[in-house]
Every structure is written in C-alpha cells, then in structure tokens.
C-alpha cells in the first residue's frame, strides 16, 4: 500500500488529513472536590436536543461533543470552546480534570442522568448499567477520538488496490477493520504514552498493584492507567470478536447480544469501535450502512492539559491510525486478542516499570524495543511521504523520549504532583487554574477572534443551547442560527429578522430620530443640521456662547463627536466641523444637555441592561505624561480595537488632542497625582470610555422613557442613549440623544465595573422562544 502513496502526490496529501470529532467527559464538582449533586445546567436545555453538551452516565458527568471537522486544529478549537462554555455556565462548580473520580457520595446517592421522561431509552440504559456494573465505576471519564479517512483517499485506494468485484463499501469496511486490528494489537503503546490515571481515592478501587500516598489516596505502584486496566471500565468478561471479515465482526457482536452478555452494541466496551453516523447505533444499522468512522475509547483525561488533551496527543493518535492503514493486514484471532488484552492490562498496571510485551508468538519483547520499533516505522513513513513536516517528526521524538525515560510520561508527572500535593488538592488546583484562565478570556470564542466581540458572544451562547451556527460572511459578522426547522439570520449580533427596515433607516438618521421622538413628546436636544461645511462655519455666531455638541448625522459608536461645555474659539469650532464632516456628509450641531450619559439596552419592550459610560480618561501620578498614562492604561488585556475586546483602547487622535487643548493641556503634560484627565467629552465605550453597570440602580422612570422611545420607532433591539440629570428634582431635564439600531452587547456582558449581563441569551430567547 505504501507504494500507492509514493507514486501519487494527491494521495500522499490526503493520507495526512481526515475528519475528526471528539467527545469529552468531565465530572462537575464543588469547590472542595465533591461530586456536584446539582442538576445539569438548565441553559444547555434537554440533553436529547443539544448536540454539543450532554451528560454521560451521571447527571453530574457532563459530556462535550464536537462536530466533525476537517483538521485537528479546528476540532481542538471546538473542544476548547465547549470546555470554556461549560466551565463558565457551571455556576460555583469546577470541571474535575482527571479520569478517576473526585470525592463521591454513597453509591445510592450518585444521580443517574435525567431525561425528558422516566422511561426514556437513555435513562433505561443507564439504569441497566447501574444494576449490572454499579454506579461508581461509571464515573470513570475520558475522551473518545472519532476519525475517518477522507472519502477521496478511500476512492483513490479503491481504484488501486480493491479486490475483484469488491464494492466500495465492502472495501471501506475492510480498510477500517484493518486499522482496528492494528489498534487492538498495539494499543498498549498508546496507553503507555497517553495514560494519565495512575492515582485515585482509596475508597474508589482496590488492586494488588497499588500503594498508599501521603494524603491517604492510592496510586498504581508502577502503573499508567487505572481506567484502562482490568480494574477499570470493562465488560464483565472479555469479548473476543472476529476481525477476519466485516460480516464475522457483526455476527460475533450479535451473538454476544443474543447470549445476554451485553444488552446492545452500546455496551460493547471495546477500546476501538467501528461505527457509522446513523443515530440508532445498533448492530443492525452498522451491518446495513457499513463503517463510516472509527471511535477510539481508551484516551484518559490528561490533568496537565486545560482541555484534557493536547494537540500533540491528537496528532500522535492520528499517526497511530495512519500506521494501522499502512501496516500489513495480519490475523487477529482470539488467542492474539487475549495477548493484546494482557499487554494492555500489563502496561496499564505496570508500565512505568517497563515490563516486557508479548508478541503474537507469545515471546517477551522489552517494552522500549517494541515501542521504538513502532515509532521508527512512523518516522519512516513521515520521512518518505511528508519529509518537510518537522512538527510530526518532533512529535515522534517526544514519544521516544517518554519510552526511554518513563519519568517523562504523563502518568509519572501526574503521580509526582499528586504525591506532593495530595489527590484532591492537586486536581482542584488544576481545575481552579483552568477556570481562572477561562474566566480571563470569557469574552472570546477561540477561532473567531477576527470577528466582532458581540458576534463572538452570541455565537458562544448559541452553542451553549445546542443551536447550529453557520458563518455566512465572516467580514460582515453575518451568521445563520438553526434549531430544528427554525432558522434565524443575524448580522453583527443584534441585526435580526425582528428589525423593521424603516425603523433602522430612522435611527440611522439622527435628524429624523429627533423629529419623530419630539413629535411624541419625548425630550431631545434642540439643534440644526448642516450639509455644507461653509454654512456650518458661518453659523458660529449662533452657537459661540452656548454649550454644544458637534456630531456626524448618521454614524455610530460615538465617532466624530466633539463637545464644548466651556467657551470655545472659532478655530476649535472649525476643527470640530472638520472631524464631524470626515465621518459624514452632514453634521448636527445641538445643545449640550448636562448630566450623566446612560445606555439603555431594550429588547422586545424590556430594558435588559443599563450602563453608565464614563468618557475616556486617565488618572495622573505626578510623574508620567498624559501620553504615557494612556499607553499604560491601554495595556489592560481587556482593552483592544475594532470591538474585539470588552473595552476599547484610548486613542490619541484629533478628537483627543482637541479635548486636551480645551483644558490647556497637551500629550506631554504631567497631571498631578489622582488628577483625572478626560480625553473625550462623549462617553462612548467605543472611543475608550469605561463602562459601569447601572441596571438595578436606574430609576424605572427613565427605563419607561427608553421603552417608549423604542416603541415610537418600532425598534425591537435598540440602544437608547439618555442624558440623566444628577439631581432627582431635575429629572424632567433629561434628553434622549441617540437611538442605536445595532447596539453593542459586549459592554453589557463585560462591563468595566458591575454585574455581567447575559445579553446573548436575551436575544436568543427573543429569536427562538
């Protein structure tokens, strides 16, 4: 088979690609390391309906399922995002990072996963498992690695090496069966290199291979993986299926089911399973539709990795499967399967002691020799078929280091840390560290960092609910959401099918907005609009003794706005006009309304959030210049540009320079200690301002005004900017200065100060409920 790839560059490229999917289980725990007895978080919806976030055996055992992707990078991004979403939505709980369980309650108190109805097949199956195996053993968690070769690769091989009169599906079945045989024979190597469950609580399991650790927990003396040993998650007795042909494979599993050894194919706990994408996952379905992918089930959670597995591990498993494809197709009889099982158990229990491996002739081979033989073969086909790939070569070298130096294995490192810190403390410390890392980047959707932050937020919230998301236009932040037959198109997170087109046009035009609101007795600032800059300049005398705002007619985000609260010169006025006309062909000059500016976010006639916006500012220290203080404040990791982070960096443009000049300051001025210097008059977060949540504190009087304004313009998702007087007695002196048809949600979700609001959830509720 190797010759087929050497001769065909297209096949060579396809060989190192594939389709990848991951399933990861984690137990939810309390802050002191006990099994969380709370229900599955309601935000994820019914387990039957969410394709991404379900439960495994227990209500406390969450399962994350990525969609099928075309690369390891993309499937890892999905896993990372799902892990982050679940972590952030599991309130006051942590995700236990080990395959072996945390502190467990009594057997009868371990909750089995709940479903829509008590007689759900999923519930009944779990009750069967609890009765047959016990509940505690079901809490062993891990990662399932789903893989299929590209269809074009199978087509190419079928054309070159299929048997006479062999159908493509029969060829495909034979191909995957061959890889499965290689995996079954050599899985001991994968367990040695990826095993990560050598430590456990003393009351969870007992084996003659264990020793006690200082904290009273237990560890396999020289072991790698309790989960993959005979003390782990196995069928009650060894089930040897016939790998000589696909039909024989199907028949042997069917015979075990008929004999009552297992209830269904779901209970066939083989380290690798042949599967197809049909949802019933019965042996009859597999027989009818044939093999579509492989499911590797023996991967432990790696507590040293935030997401339970590294990309290097994923790449190595891929290479392992490629090796299976390129290897000779050898018989895997019951005797050989028994030897393979013994090798697996021996490595799982004694791998760090480097025991010998039994070959098919029952001969002892030193572990390092046997492992290096397989790794060298992988190196050879990488050199032959992908010589330029230094990353894959480095991955193989890393595995060789682990073979030659057992202390470098994942299992040895985990055992060392648990011995030092204690079983519960080590895993809790890891879980807390990973949670802190997740919280620090809670606003981010991995792989979508180039998109607007509000888009990332609503996308994450859609994933949490199991809503399918398609990117229609990345540059335009245009998404399609689908839940069942219900489809919604959303642009920039808040432009939806609920929008009224004329309402958007009215809000886009600030002159029209003010006219319509004023006609409905809603207070707005008085002013004039100008389309000719020369005429606007000539009107200087009308405004020179007033407090005014100069702003573009139709822009958003506070761009191009200048505010004069104190006396200003003709030159200042002209510069403000230059700035405003640079953003639009028309400008508005209106009265300045004293007070504090608040953003009211109204969704479907309800105020969901209120934000006080403080203009861009720095606080002096008596040492640094204004420019240096801005540079320092902009180092905050939550500040970015183009709405990709919760806060915007403070700019040093003409608007800010003008503002400084109005205070008789420059960029080189050194403010006194604790002196606050404002760089903008307008308080938009989009121009570097600070956001403070005021939802609970805001008077209902102003909330009702915000709602009434959106109703006048028939706006369903709207940002209402209101100047609120500081004194209650003056509240009738408020004014609405703007309505926004595309309000940013991120500043409510991640304010500079105050409670974070789940605005993505509110919009999705509006769209789908």
Curated annotation (Swiss-Prot):
Binding site for Mn(2+) 1: 721, 738
Stated name of the protein: Glutathione biosynthesis bifunctional protein GshAB
Region spans: Glutamate--cysteine ligase: 1-347
Taxonomic path: Bacteria, Bacillati, Bacillota, Bacilli, Bacillales
Enzyme Commission code(s) on record: 6.3.2.2, 6.3.2.3
Its job: Synthesizes glutathione from L-glutamate and L-cysteine via gamma-L-glutamyl-L-cysteine.
Catalytic function, reaction form: L-cysteine + L-glutamate + ATP = gamma-L-glutamyl-L-cysteine + ADP + phosphate + H(+); gamma-L-glutamyl-L-cysteine + glycine + ATP = glutathione + ADP + phosphate + H(+)
Residues holding Mg(2+) 2: 738, 740
Cofactor names: Mg(2+); Mn(2+)
């Amino acid at each position: 088979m190797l010759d087929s790839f050497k001769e065909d560059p297209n096949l060579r490229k396809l060989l190192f690609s594939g389709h990848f999917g991951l399933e990861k289980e984690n137990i939810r725990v309390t802050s002191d390391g006990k099994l969380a007895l709370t229900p599955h978080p309601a935000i994820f919806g019914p387990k039957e309906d969410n394709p991404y976030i379900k439960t495994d055996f227990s209500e406390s055992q969450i399962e994350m399922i990525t969609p099928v992707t075309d690369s390891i990078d993309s499937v890892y991004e999905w896993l990372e995002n799902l892990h982050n979403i679940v972590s952030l939505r599991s309130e006051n709980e942590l995700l236990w990072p080990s395959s072996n369980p945390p502190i467990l309650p009594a057997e009868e108190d371990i909750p089995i996963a709940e479903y829509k109805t008590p007689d759900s097949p999923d519930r009944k199956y779990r009750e069967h498992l609890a009765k047959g195996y016990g509940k505690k053993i079901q809490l062993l968690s891990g990662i399932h690695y789903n893989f299929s070769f590209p269809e074009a690769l199978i087509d190419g091989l079928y054309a070159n090496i299929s048997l006479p009169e062999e159908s493509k599906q029969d060829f495909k079945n034979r191909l995957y069966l061959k890889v499965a045989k290689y995996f079954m024979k050599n899985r001991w190597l994968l367990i040695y290199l990826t095993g990560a469950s050598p430590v456990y609580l003393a009351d969870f399991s007992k084996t003659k291979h264990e020793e006690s650790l200082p904290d009273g927990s237990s560890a396999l003396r020289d072991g790698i993986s309790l989960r993959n040993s005979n003390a782990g998650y196995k069928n009650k007795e060894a089930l040897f299926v016939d790998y000589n042909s696909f039909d024989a494979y199907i028949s042997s599993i069917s015979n075990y089911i008929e004999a009552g050894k297992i209830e269904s194919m779901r209970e066939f706990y083989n380290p690798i399973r042949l599967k197809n994408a049909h949802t019933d996952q019965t042996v009859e379905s597999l027989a009818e539709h044939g093999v579509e992918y492989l499911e590797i089930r023996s991967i432990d959670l790696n507590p040293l990795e935030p997401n339970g597995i590294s990309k290097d591990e994923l790449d190595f498993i891929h290479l392992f499967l490629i090796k299976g494809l390129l290897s000779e197709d050898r018989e895997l009889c019951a005797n050989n399967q028994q030897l393979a099982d013994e090798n697996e158990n021996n490595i799982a229990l004694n791998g760090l002691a480097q025991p010998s491996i039994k070959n098919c002739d029952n001969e002892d081979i030193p572990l390092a020799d046997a492992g290096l033989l397989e790794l060298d073969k992988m190196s050879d086909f990488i050199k032959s078929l992908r010589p330029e790939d230094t990353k894959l070569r480095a991955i193989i070298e890393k595995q060789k280091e682990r073979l030659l130096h057992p202390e470098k294995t994942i299992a040895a490192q985990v055992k060392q840390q648990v011995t030092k810190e204690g079983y519960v403390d080590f895993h809790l410390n890891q879980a807390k560290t990973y949670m802190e890392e997740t919280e620090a980047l809670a606003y981010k959707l991995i792989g979508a960092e180039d998109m607007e932050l509000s888009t990332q937020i609503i996308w994450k919230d859609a994933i949490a609910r199991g809503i399918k998301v398609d990117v229609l236009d990345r540059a335009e932040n245009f998404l399609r959401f689908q839940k069942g037959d219900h489809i919604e198109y959303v642009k920039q997170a808040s432009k939806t099918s609920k929008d009224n087109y004329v309402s958007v046009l009215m809000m886009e035009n600030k002159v029209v907005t003010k006219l319509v609101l004023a006609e409905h007795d809603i207070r707005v600032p008085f002013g004039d609009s100008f389309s000719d800059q020369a005429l606007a300049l000539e009107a200087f005398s009308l405004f020179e003794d007033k407090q005014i705002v100069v702003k573009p007619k139709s822009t958003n985000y506070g761009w191009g706005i200048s505010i004069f609260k104190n006396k200003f010169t003709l030159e200042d006025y002209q510069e403000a006009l230059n700035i405003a006309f640079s953003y639009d062909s028309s400008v508005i000059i209106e009265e300045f309304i004293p007070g504090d500016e608040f953003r009211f976010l109204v969704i479907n006639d309800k105020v969901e959030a209120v934000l006080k916006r403080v203009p861009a500012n720095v606080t002096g220290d008596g040492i640094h210049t204004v420019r240096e203080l801005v540079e320092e404040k902009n180092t905050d990791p939550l500040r970015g540009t183009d709405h990709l982070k919760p806060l915007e960096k403070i700019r040093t443009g003409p608007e800010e320079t003008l503002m400084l000049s109005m205070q008789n300051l420059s960029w080189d001025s050194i403010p006194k200690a604790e002196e606050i210097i404002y760089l903008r008059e307008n308080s938009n977060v989009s121009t570097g301002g600070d956001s403070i949540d005021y939802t609970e504190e805001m008077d209902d009087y102003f909330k009702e005004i915000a709602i009434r304004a959106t109703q006048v313009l028939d706006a369903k998702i709207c940002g209402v900017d209101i100047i609120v007087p500081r004194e209650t007695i003056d509240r009738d002196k408020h004014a609405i200065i703007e309505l926004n048809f595309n309000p940013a949600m991120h500043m409510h979700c991640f304010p500079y100060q105050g409670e974070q609001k789940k605005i993505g959830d509110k919009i999705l509720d509006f769209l789908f409920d």
